[in-house]
Amino acid sequence: MLRVALTGGIGSGKSLVGEILEELGALVIDSDQLAREVIERGSPGYEEVVTAFGDSILSEGQIDRSKLAAVVFNESDLRKKLESIIHPLVREAAEKLARKLPSGAILINQIPLLVESDGAKRFDYVVTVSADEEIRRERLRLRGLKDYEITQRIAAQVSDLEREKITNYIIRNDGSIDELTRAVEALMANELLPRAQKQGL
């Protein structure tokens, strides 16, 4: 199995790249989705997060992600505390899913905070999606985020330069969806499929 990490800053287009890779036959695990699942009520991380951050982050008994974000995004110590709870649980959940896959599979782990979680060494190959910051900001505005929230979230992540230090392949996503699709198809044909085939031998 070829284990690929797919990373990039908020608003870069990671999810779209993940969707295209899935259409091309890769199996995609979305760490953001797993992060939501591991802190749902009744899940392993729920009690830990509520104990760490208090009842003010709850809405009707569930952890309210926007309330939690408001607490942690301005405080790097609190953000690190949250990450120290969530990251191990997400890794464990991803590993369980990976164990069910056939040996020749291409497994894409979509991980926004790959550098921050020091997770690159667990993968055979790292792909970074990057885009001009103003384009990313515009995409995030379209998602309904306010400018100050966008600034906080971008500031909470490492720079593209830091991501590129651990990257094997960079996909620029400043253009059209057609251009992005062609770039992802080239990644699959020229890099991922040959590597997966070699591993399967």
Task: Enumerate the predicted regions with their spans.
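Residue-level signal for inorganic ion chemistry
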Residues: G13, D32, L82, I108, ...
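ATP-dependent small-molecule kinase phosphotransfer cores
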Residues: Q33-I106
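An amphipathic alpha-helix signature
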Residues: L24, Y46-V50, E133-E138, T151
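Walker A (P-loop) phosphate-binding motif
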Residues: M1-A26, S31-Q33
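Short, acidic/turn-prone active-site loops that include or flank metal/cofactor-
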Residues: Q33-R36, I57, A131-E134, A155-A156, ...
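ATP-dependent NMP and nucleoside kinases share a basic, alpha-helical "lid"
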Residues: A93-L101, I106-L142
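Small-molecule kinase domains that catalyze NTP-dependent phosphoryl transfer to phosphate-bearing small molecules
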Residues: A94, A120-R122, E138, L142-L192, ...
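Short gly/ser/thr-rich secondary-structure transition/capping motifs
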Residues: P88-E92, L107-P112, T151-A156
